[in-house]
Each structure stands twice: as C-alpha cells, then as structure tokens.
C-alpha cells in the first residue's frame, strides 16, 4: 500500500519542509488546558459561545473546548486578509458570517494567531456592534513586535517571534494544518527569503 497511512507518516512526509519546531504538541496541550481552566473560572455559571475564525482556528477551538468545563455553543466565521501570501494584507473580507444572533450572549472569539492585529480589530468591532453581553479573545499564538493596533487580549497561549509559522491549524497554501505542533518552514518551502 502506498501513501500516507498514519499521522507519523504525514509528519515525516512534510519533514523536509520544516525548519524547526517552535512549540511541541505537549506544550500546546498543556497551555490549552491552562487556558481552559481560566476560561471555566472566569465564566463560571454561564453559557459561552465560542466563535472560531476559519480555517486556522478550528484545531485550536476543538482542543480548547475539551478543556472548558461549561455549557458551550459553537459558531464560525471565515475571513480573509492573507490570500496566498505569508503576510496579512490588512484588507479584511468576511467570507462566512455567523449563524447565531450575538445579542446578550457571552462570546469568546477563538483565533489561531494574532499578527498585525488588523483583522482582529475589524472582527472585534464587527462583533461588538451585534451587542453581545461580553466579548473576549482567546488566541493560541501572538507574534511579538508587529502589532499595528493595540489590542487587549484576555487569553493568550504563546508569544512567538515574527516568523511565518505552520501547523496546528496554521497553513501555507492549505498545507501543514494538521501537523500536531507549530513550526517554521524552510524558506525554499514557501518562496521566502
């Protein structure tokens, strides 16, 4: 039988493209458990709507939700500010809007990564206009030193250097999302310098 048959095979198939692993699978799970505990404590006695920003946040949101000990509902938005590039364009387009009416709900926006903050600022303004009872952000990753707008982020997993990263929901050209860790790519894998 040919092809990829296990996660280990998949990871090995992409190994030539990986420069280095920044955050291991175990480190991610430990951090998500910690974030889940904080969220559970902060929203004790309440129901919470998790809003995932597609496509990258689906992996983070699925695992984070397993660590939150509250009644949860789920919804998704799809936005684009990258296209096929490795840096955000700053122009945000909503490709898929929410199914829920947010008015009066406690909402936690789940992001895979915060880069410049421009997309997140746009989303927060858009969602706040829908009058939720509360609106906070949980992001697995935040790139340091490149934010163009100040943002108050309540739940942050890891601060990372301003490098292009893949894995754990993050992609390059729709590849690498299901790697169980966060890694950098070799420049030749994406045409970087």
Model regions: which residues?
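PRPP-associated nucleotide enzymes
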Residues: 1-193
């Amino acid at each position: 039988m040919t092809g990829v048959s296990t996660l280990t095979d998949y990871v090995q198939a992409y190994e030539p493209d990986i420069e280095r692993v920044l955050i291991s699978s175990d480190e991610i799970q430990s951090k998500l458990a910690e974030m889940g505990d904080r969220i559970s404590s902060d929203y004790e006695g309440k129901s919470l709507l998790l809003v995932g920003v597609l496509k990258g946040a689906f992996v983070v949101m699925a695992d984070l939700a397993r660590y939150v000990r509250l009644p949860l509902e789920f919804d998704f938005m799809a936005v684009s500010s990258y296209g096929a590039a490795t840096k955000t364009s700053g122009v945000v387009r909503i490709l898929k809007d929410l199914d829920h009416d947010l008015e009066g709900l406690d909402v936690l926006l789940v992001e895979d990564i915060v880069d410049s903050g421009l997309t997140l600022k746009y989303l927060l303004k858009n969602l706040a206009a829908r009058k939720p009872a509360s609106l906070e952000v949980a992001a697995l990753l935040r790139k340091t030193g490149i934010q163009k707008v100040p943002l108050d982020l309540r739940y942050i997993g890891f601060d990372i250097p301003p490098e292009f990263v893949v894995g754990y929901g993050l992609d390059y050209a729709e590849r690498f999302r299901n790697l169980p860790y966060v890694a950098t790519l070799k420049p030749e894998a994406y045409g970087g310098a």
